[in-house]
Amino acid sequence: MIRIGHGFDVHAFGEKRPLIIGGVTIPYHTGFIAHSDGDVALHALTDALLGAAALGDIGKLFPDTDQQYKNIDSRKLLIEAYRQVQTKGYQISNIDITIIAQAPKMRPHIDNMRQLIANDLNCDIDQINIKATTTEKLGFTGRGEGIACEAVALLSKKTV
């Protein structure tokens, strides 16, 4: 059996903190306003994985009202979510992530993002695709007010 999940996340810029996307710290003059580290790529991916396994969403599993998740590294959330997906007997077939940002440029960081995600999910880097696009200066991402991200995860039942 195969299952597909879709995730979406968005965060506004506005805090003097590191900008972390896909687990990678990206040099930029500002970071995200967020309860956790604000990693839009990992949040969207976590939602996609949870959705594919019918386990709800990131807010259900890691509510932003819980102080234990304040400023947490989103890689920890991703790893825990995937552990729960695995308990239902699923494994990753492939992941596709689209980062929507006018700036900063993502291309120099995508290979590092892919490798970190592959390591965290114990899968091959060829199962992880990440791409970036702009909105041609339209909307909040185009005005440089924040970044959005979509992720799709395809899961398959583990074979013994």
Swiss-Prot record:
**EC number per UniProt:** 4.6.1.12
Site label Transition state stabilizer, positions:
35, 134
Q: Which residues bind 4-CDP-2-C-methyl-D-erythritol 2-phosphate?
A: 9-11, 35-36, 57-59, 62-66, 133-136, 140, 143
Q: Its Gene Ontology biological processes?
A: isopentenyl diphosphate biosynthetic process, methylerythritol 4-phosphate pathway; terpenoid biosynthetic process
Q: How is the cofactor bound?
A: Binds 1 divalent metal cation per subunit.
Annotated catalysed reactions: 4-CDP-2-C-methyl-D-erythritol 2-phosphate = 2-C-methyl-D-erythritol 2,4-cyclic diphosphate + CMP
This chain belongs to which protein, by name?
2-C-methyl-D-erythritol 2,4-cyclodiphosphate synthase
Q: Which organism is it from?
A: Haemophilus ducreyi (strain 35000HP / ATCC 700724)
